[in-house]
Amino acid sequence: MSFSIRPDRRFPICCPVIYHVGLREGHGIVWNLSANGWRLSGDVPLRIGQTCPLTVNVPGQHPLFVAGVTLRWVRGQEYGVETVVVEKQTHSRLEHWITRLAQKSVECTP
């Protein structure tokens, strides 16, 4: 396994997620996110290289639909996915959410 540095900062979250693999619907939790990726766990197995859509239930907002993520790594039922297809409006919502998370993390720093 090669080592690589992530290009974007990841922020811890805990949000329900639904994803679709073929005819199967998976349910899980998103544990962290960045501008380009997500770490999630789920009940339907995924394989490296698979592409699937995600619907993330963001607290206090409408669900965030990401049309396509590609699976980059697997550890048991934990998955690292890269965002590859997202609508412009959804991308703007995601950027706004990340900006808010970044501001909160600065406020919490002693």
Model-derived features: positions:
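Structured alpha-helical
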Residues: M1-P110
